[in-house]
Amino acid sequence: MSAYIIETLIKILILVAVFSALGGFATYIERKVLAYFQRRLGPCYVGPFGLLQVAADGIKLFTKEDIIPQGANKFIFTLAPIIAMVSAFVSMAPIPFFPNFTLFGYEIKPLISDINIGFLFFLAVGAAGIYAPILAGLASNNKYSLIGSARATIQLLSFEVVSTLTILAPLMVVGSLSLVEINHYQSGGFLDWLVFKQPLAFVLFLIASYAELNRTPFDLLEHEAEIVAGYCTEYSGLKWGMFFLAEYAHLFAFSFVISIVFFGGFNAWGFIPGGLAILIKAGFFVFLSMWVRATYPHVRPDQLMDMCWKIMLPLALLNIVLTGIIILI
């Protein structure tokens, strides 16, 4: 077995382990953040400051009975959470999480695969995760799951179009689909960040990301007050945990991608080294998603579709046209 294959396998194991742990810990952080906004304590009983709540929740998930509803399609019911997990982690392959570094005289590239269409790969594989809630809802033999599945089809496909069109303008400026090249394009300093050249694209992509991630206020797929848990209604135990973990893994992936594309990525930020800089940026966007959840109410499905097709899509197309004109001039 070649050194390249061994290195890649080690990177994959580290990536899955780290982001699985981060996904679990993010639940604790989110509950604490929401508690702060609502003037509550949040988790505080299990361990110091409630830090062991994550371990307690993990034990509960792994020991719960795995139930498959009567009349459900067992194969598809089991396949759906696997698709969610695989798409979330595979989409991270072209993301450069840190600058290159040397370990024991060997240069390490902290990404799985440096492909020249990295951004397209990220969007395409992430979009494949749309099949998870659709199949889960169709296979569950439950009316609430079916409604959640229908909402997933409409919402995720609609915003996939918007996010793809939105990101075309920054890619036109850089001239590359590689996330590594996009990062290097902004290496000149703070003012080279694409957020200053493409502020509209940043805002549109951030909103579309929240809709694709099923984050509040766009969590129509599993809105508790309307459809119980949506496509997840019949899931329990490990299968439910896989959906849950995939959602947080995708949140971290989008946070890193937004940091790389619009905020200079892992380039040094003043006196702050690049590795620490990208962690601060990605951490901020994870926190921002929690802040938005605590602040904004849910939107209705018709309001969401109106915003997508009547506001965001025309703005994305207008931004592409204006960017093309500016480049030609």
Swiss-Prot record:
Single GO MF descriptor: NADH dehydrogenase activity
Keywords: Cell inner membrane, Cell membrane, Membrane, NAD, Quinone, Translocase, Transmembrane, Transmembrane helix, Ubiquinone
UniProt EC number: 7.1.1.-
One cellular-component annotation, GO: plasma membrane
InterPro entries to which the protein is assigned, alphabetical: NADH_UbQ_OxRdtase_su1/FPO, NADH_UbQ_OxRdtase_su1_CS
Record bears the keyword Secreted: no
Membrane topology classification: Multi-pass membrane protein
GO biological process: aerobic respiration
Catalytic reaction(s) noted: a quinone + NADH + 5 H(+)(in) = a quinol + NAD(+) + 4 H(+)(out)
Spans traversing the lipid bilayer: 9-29, 42-62, 75-95, 117-137, 154-174, 188-208, 238-258, 260-280, 309-329
Function: NDH-1 shuttles electrons from NADH, via FMN and iron-sulfur (Fe-S) centers, to quinones in the respiratory chain. The immediate electron acceptor for the enzyme in this species is believed to be ubiquinone. Couples the redox reaction to proton translocation (for every two electrons transferred, four hydrogen ions are translocated across the cytoplasmic membrane), and thus conserves the redox energy in a proton gradient. This subunit may bind ubiquinone.
Matching Pfam families: NADHdh
Chief location bin: membrane
Family: Belongs to the complex I subunit 1 family.
Record localization: Cell inner membrane
Protein name per UniProt: NADH-quinone oxidoreductase subunit H
Subunit description: NDH-1 is composed of 14 different subunits. Subunits NuoA, H, J, K, L, M, N constitute the membrane sector of the complex.
Source taxon at top rank: Bacteria
Annotated source species: Helicobacter pylori (strain G27)
